[in-house]
């Protein structure tokens, strides 16, 4: 398969994008976990053992070996997984639809917290230079984040190729710092033995269990491995993890532990304290660059997730800007960028330190991992045809581990973790209302219309006033399968262009559609045709470009020039009515009506890439 190809360039690229988040966890994870308990050899070995086995079981085994199997034709992520289940026509689709949109909301919440905790933790290294610099940590971090979000509209095409080498420098740096400490105190290598993890949990009891909330911070970012399969492929990601990221992370964690065994007072900032004093400033700079790259990767992943949601019809057609002519995956979503910016800055200003942010971080990622586990477990039974016993045994273990971490993370809900969860519920509700509203619109306003060919006969189509030399392209939306824009045009004008093409697009439950499966055409009359254009959920919808290719391939029965044709789109005005109940709640109808009014006219034209000077919007009125 194409997505399974391997090159060192792809592996380096994966290093810069996929592992930025999990790769910067050493800045704060061990510090947060060990805070509040005695810093002694027994506790340090226990915590290091838990870190080691968490990375091995959750990331190395569960994600890279099992979850990676659940790709959708080379694409990963929770929405791609939902599309896979729809494509395979599995049962319980409505249930997994709810699960997937809630998971997508959780990832958006994570996109606010990750830049905040990453950048703040890096800039906190200034405190190692002088205590007088601590008051400047938050202002400097805020300036960096403002610049980061402000530059999103420019794209990363010019500097994106540097991400891999820069993160490689980061991993090599933290590995060397760890090795220097391990050589002096090799006793920490005993932590590889799982006995130390078990003994620590038994000895600490309930307090040790809740420390798993800190341990979980070392695997946050692991969910990005699955989501980024489509960008780099499975094998480059696996190579980067097993040969670079995993060894370097373990060396650094163990190095921090080795230093704390002999210098427990350095728990205030164990990451920076393992470096020699002369290297503090260069390390702060390298760490800041690494956290900015990690934040950029999370922001880009959120943009990509939003595009998938729009194309799959899960949310309104919000503006999506292509920032690169060469790479379709490089996009900018202004409204999502603004939401992430406001959320990230609010977290920074409210929590102020990485320690405080850590008390809110992780629970959203934990829930998302749990949801992915459940969906992949069902895919293993219904799609892969694994035996029920094997699925229960394997995924039962995964779910047990994730539930254990979730229980340990529950206290984070009241210390700030509620924000991404509430946001996830809000986003899921918007997606649900949008999807349900479109289905109601289709079933009650468009599905019951008579077939166009019958209407053309009733109207005695050939006797209508003809507009010679005029070609019109009528675009129908996802909820309209009957050519509503064309019918409204006939009703209003009682005349027809010489050539009429009714275009409907369908986003299939696969990432990319082959050219041979792109077009379906049905001729309703000599000069009236209905064309269905198929897209994948990772593609960019461009109606004029697709029509131009169709004309060049002589797919259409008549010739017309796309550059001079007129495009027609229908703009429905939805009104909520208290007299009749269409959706679950009146305010849900109001929400859907608001979304339709604000994301129809101009955005439809932008979404389809139609020329403004040759596009006519036809209004219609619907009462829910």
Swiss-Prot record:
Q: Where in the cell is it found?
A: Cell inner membrane
Q: Which InterPro entries match?
A: K+_transporter, K_trans_C, K_trans_N, Kup
Name a GO molecular-function annotation: potassium ion transmembrane transporter activity
Topological type in the membrane: Multi-pass membrane protein
Q: What catalytic reaction does the record list? A: K(+)(in) + H(+)(in) = K(+)(out) + H(+)(out)
Keyword check for Glycoprotein, yes or no: no
Protein family per UniProt:
Belongs to the HAK/KUP transporter (TC 2.A.72) family.
Primary role: Transport of potassium into the cell. Likely operates as a K(+):H(+) symporter.
Per its record, how is this protein called by name?
Probable potassium transport system protein Kup 1
Question: What lineage does UniProt assign to this protein's organism?
Answer: Bacteria, Pseudomonadati, Pseudomonadota, Gammaproteobacteria, Legionellales
């Amino acid at each position: 398969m194409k997505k399974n190809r391997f090159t060192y360039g792809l592996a380096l690229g994966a290093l810069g994008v996929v592992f930025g988040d999990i790769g910067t966890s050493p800045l704060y994870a061990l510090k947060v976990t060990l805070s509040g308990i005695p810093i002694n050899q027994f506790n340090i070995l226990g915590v290091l053992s838990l870190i080691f086995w968490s990375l091995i079981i959750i990331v190395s085994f569960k994600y890279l070996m099992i979850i990676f199997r659940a790709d959708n034709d080379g694409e990963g992520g929770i929405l791609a997984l939902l599309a896979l289940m729809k494509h395979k026509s599995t049962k319980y689709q409505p249930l997994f639809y709810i699960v997937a949109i809630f998971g997508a909301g959780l990832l958006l919440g994570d996109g606010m917290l990750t830049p905040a905790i990453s950048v703040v933790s890096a800039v906190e290294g200034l405190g190692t230079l002088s205590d007088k610099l601590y008051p400047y940590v938050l202002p400097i971090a805020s300036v960096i984040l403002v610049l980061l979000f402000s530059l999103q509209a420019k794209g990363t095409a010019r500097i994106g190729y540097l991400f891999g080498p820069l993160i490689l420098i980061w991993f090599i740096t933290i590995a060397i710092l760890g090795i220097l400490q391990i050589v002096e105190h090799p006793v920490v290598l005993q932590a590889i033995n799982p006995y130390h993890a078990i003994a620590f949990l038994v000895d600490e009891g309930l307090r040790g269990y809740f420390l798993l909330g800190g341990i979980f911070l070392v695997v946050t970012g692991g969910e990005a491995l699955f989501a980024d399969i489509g960008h780099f492929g499975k094998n480059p990601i696996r190579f980067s993890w097993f040969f670079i990221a995993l060894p370097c992370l373990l060396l650094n964690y163990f190095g921090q532990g080795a230093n704390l065994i002999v210098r427990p007072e350095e728990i205030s900032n164990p990451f920076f304290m393992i470096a020699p004093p002369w290297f503090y400033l260069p390390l702060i700079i390298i760490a800041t660059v690494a956290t900015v790259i990690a934040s950029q990767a999370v922001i880009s992943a959120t943009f990509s997730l939003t595009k998938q949601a729009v194309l799959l019809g899960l949310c309104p057609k919000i503006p999506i800007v292509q920032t690169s002519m060469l790479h379709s995956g490089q996009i900018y979503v202004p409204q999502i960028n603004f939401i992430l910016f406001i959320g990230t800055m609010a977290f920074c200003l409210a929590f102020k330190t990485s320690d405080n942010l850590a008390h809110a971080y992780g629970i959203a990622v934990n829930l998302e991992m749990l949801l992915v586990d459940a969906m992949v477990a069902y895919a293993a039974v219904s799609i892969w045809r694994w035996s029920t016993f094997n699925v229960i045994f394997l995924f039962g273990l995964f779910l047990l581990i994730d539930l254990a971490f979730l229980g340990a993370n529950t206290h984070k809900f009241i210390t700030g973790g509620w924000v991404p969860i509430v946001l996830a519920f809000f986003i899921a509700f918007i997606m649900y209302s949008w999807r349900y509203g479109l289905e109601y619109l289709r079933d009650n306003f468009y599905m019951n219309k008579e077939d166009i060919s019958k209407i053309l006969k009733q109207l005695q189509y050939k006797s209508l006033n003809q507009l010679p030399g005029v070609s019109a392209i009528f675009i129908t939306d996802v909820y309209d399968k009957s050519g509503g824009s064309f019918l409204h045009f006939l009703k209003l004008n009682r005349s027809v262009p010489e050539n009429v093409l009714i275009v409907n697009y369908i986003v299939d439950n696969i990432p990319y559609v082959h050219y041979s499966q792109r077009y379906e055409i049905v001729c309703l009359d000599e000069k009236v045709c209905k064309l269905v254009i198929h897209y994948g959920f990772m593609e960019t919808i461009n109606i004029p470009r697709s029509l131009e290719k169709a004309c060049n391939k002589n797919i259409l029965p008549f010739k017309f020039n796309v550059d001079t044709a007129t495009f027609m789109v229908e703009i429905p005005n939805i009104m909520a009515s208290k007299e009749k109940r269409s959706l679950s709640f009146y305010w849900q109808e109001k929400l859907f009506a608001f979304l339709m009014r604000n994301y129809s006219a101009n955005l439809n034209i932008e979404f389809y890439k139609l020329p403004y000077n040759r596009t006519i919007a036809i209004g219609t009125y619907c009462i829910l």
